[in-house]
Amino acid sequence: MSYFDYEGNRIFYEEIGEGKPLILLHGNTASSKMFTPIIPFFSEKHHVITMDFLGCGQSDRLSKWPTDLWYEWSRQVVALCDYKGFEKIGLIGCSGGAIVAINVALEYPDRINAVVADSFEGIKASSSITEQIRIGRHYAKQNEEFCSMLKVMHGDDWEKVVDADTEAVVNHAKTVGAFFHRPFSELQSKILLTGSAEDEMFPKGHYEKLFYNICSQTSFAESHIFEHGGHPAMMSNMQEFVSMCKELFD
């Protein structure tokens, strides 16, 4: 198992395949293990890297998670790139990981070849969606299948991980709000936005409004909304998603 040091804590990462570096970024309450089914499709031609953000998966735990969570996670991605000596990378972010990927592209434009941002909430936190997340996780912890999945992702302390994540999400919505420190007009690399029209996490029409908003701010953005499939779209529409990514990155 591979780790690198980040501000006194160990971050877990894995590498598969050869070629240009392509980093896959997991979402909230998940870990890099979520990408197990999709990695083989990308590792044929790319040097695929996955990582567990601090507090998640096989990375070190934190006594308290940062409030500006996704911005902080973007710094961890760049720290991994510095550690490995990656000058230019491709990024695929899923859900919360998509917010991280966009933050990296906005804050470190010289490090990015292209980005895919899949199934994410928006430009700023929504109070109604945040409350839905909080309530949904509370009840989900009573679901045996959900609990088993999280134990695979994080280990025996999965419930503490979920609670810490939820606390950070709620605190961010209350005290920070914005997911990004810079406007999309400052993007300097191609970004593909993807989501499913049937995503159960968000209201109907969520992605149409969000993607129109982003694409109106920058010529670097393109979008695709899958007609069917649950959250996240990259897993529920895997084959089509992979094909679109290969066209972007190859």
Whereabouts are the PLM-identified features?
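Conserved HGGG/HGGXW glycine-rich cap/lid loop of the alpha/beta-hydrolase fold
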Residues: 9-62
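Short alpha-helix in the alpha/beta-hydrolase fold that links the catalytic acid
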Residues: 180, 189, 203-214
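Conserved alpha/beta-hydrolase "nucleophile elbow" surrounding the catalytic nucleophile
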Residues: 28, 89, 93-95
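Active-site loop/oxyanion-hole signature of alpha/beta-hydrolase fold enzymes
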Residues: 50-90
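Flexible "cap/lid" loop of the alpha/beta hydrolase fold
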Residues: 99-107, 111-145
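Active-site nucleophile elbow and catalytic-triad environment of alpha/beta-hydrolase enzymes
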Residues: 167-183
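Short beta-strand/loop motif that positions the catalytic acidic residue
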Residues: 187, 193-195, 199
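Catalytic active-site module of serine/aspartate enzymes centered on a nucleophile-bearing elbow/loop
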Residues: 221-250
